[in-house]
Every structure is written in C-alpha cells, then in structure tokens.
C-alpha cells in the first residue's frame, strides 16, 4: 500500500541572477522582512538602499544654520525629514518647527516620523507640517503668526530617494512606467502628456536650459520622432480627439541611447548615463515649474527671516545654484543679508563614498541683516 501523493510543492520564485529583470528581485532591500540583511549589504557597498533616503551634508547644514533651543525653524522642503529631525533636536526645549512639502504621498509619512520624534524629545506640539509649496512661505508665516520671521530656514531642492525608488511615480528610468515626475500627482500634467505636445525645438531648448545637456539636440530629435510615431500609430485617438497614450520612461531612455548610437567606449557609456540623469532632471524641473517656484522663494526669503536669521539651500543642478548665488549676492549688496557663503560647500569624499547621491549637492548659506535697509519691506 502506498501513501496518496500530497499536494504539489510550490516552488519559490527563482532569483534571476546578477541582472534580474523584476524590480522586487533587484532591489531586495525594500523587503526587510524577507531579506533582513540586504539593507546593510547595500550600505556597506557604498550605495543608498532603494526606498530609503539618506540626507546629505547634514553636519554642514547644521553648522551653517546653528539652530539653538527656543528658536523657530522652517524646513521648506521636508521630504523624508532627515534634516528636520536633526534641527528639531537642537531647537528644543522651547523651539518650534514648521515643515512644508507639496508631495501628498510622502508628506503624511514624514509628518508621522517627525511627530514621533517630537514626542520622544518631550514636546509633541513642537512640530507642524503643512502641504504647501515653498514659494508661498511668506504668506504661510503670516498665517502662522510668524510675520516677524523664522530664525532658521532650510530648503533642500533635491528629489527624495523615496520618489526615485517608487515605480509608480515615474521619476526614474529604472522602471518602465508612464512618465509622470510630478511632485504632486494631483496637480498639473504628467510629463508623458506634456512632452507629447512639444515641438523638437522646445524639447531641445528645455534640455539645454534646465539640464545643461550637451546632447540635447539628439535626444530632442529622438523624443520628437517618438511623438510623431505615436500620432501615426494612433489615428483613432486623433480622429476622436482622445488623448494619446502617455510617453513612458523607456521612451526617454531609448531617446538618450539613440543620441549615443555608435559610441561604445567606456567613456561614452558613462556619458550616456550622465545624460540620462540630466534629461530626467530637466523634465522634472519643467513639469513642476521648479525654477519659477525657486525664484519666488528666493525673492521672499530675506523677509521670511528674523533679524540675524540663517538660511541654507541645497541645490543639485547648476541652474538652481546660479539662481541661489545671484540672489544671495544681490541681497548682500542691498543690505538684506549681513553675510553669505563665499564658496559653495560640497560633500566630503567620505560622504560621497557612502552616499553617491550627495555627489552633486551644493550648499549655500546666508545670514539676515539685523535690520532692513530703509524703504525695503
């Protein structure tokens, strides 16, 4: 007599080698329950674990801002909240932290982390988070009865690692998904829709202007050709006045690859990757109108600071840095700032090794004058 066969054993999914195709196989550190050691392995290799965020230039930011107990601080671009958490620790007891962000997906998570941090430090009422673009900071301070200004203001203009590593957000070429790149998915048009309506010259212009991209002409030509192919393959959409299918992240990747077609050297491969980063960054800046928001923030910044207040801004793009440098210099000459950074502050080699995303970060700071020049409000 033989035993009846049991149910067939369920085979576990095979890992696809050193170059897996599926996101969850390649970025196993996102699943700490199944792969508890992966996060530490990634950190030890000098990379940032997917789905997490390591704040950049923390020591340098704290040195520039010098937050002290009892002060009012503003994190104008909260993100994950790494910088805000360190600032909060230094303004307590008696301090107050106001934190802003436009991302409706990440803001509640960061708010919960900060609230817990404040409670652990003994003052659960010390933090307030607000869904607001930093361009409206001056108005927000009035609403919060802080018209006299804040003692400390930080703005970190980089995209957070959580946004980059979330496949559904369309921020990264790592995932073949509809091209979105909106900080606030409920506002404006996704990038894949906006680019479909742009002319080749318009695409080339913003890639040069917002991305400093040397291969802008070739990338723009390839993207425009993709747009034309979409129109040609979707006659019913056009006849019925329906929206065309959105461009995907893979369309942008393919456009960059076409711009480098025929170049196979190691240098060309590294240059292609840099172009890919700059192209996605330029599209993100365009879609979110980031430079206009930055200009508005810089214009109001001196009037958001209390006398002697300190501001620090982290940039990740030369166009952003030029604007900050110019605004700080103009404010110094107008007597609005008492001091500004003489040189840009960069991440140390040690930090760049541990956190590659810090490599492009630039920090500039300014100190508000004790009083406004006559006639300036």
Residue ranges, per PLM feature:
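S-adenosyl-L-methionine-dependent methyltransferase catalytic core, i.e., the SAM/SAH-binding region
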Residues: 1-377
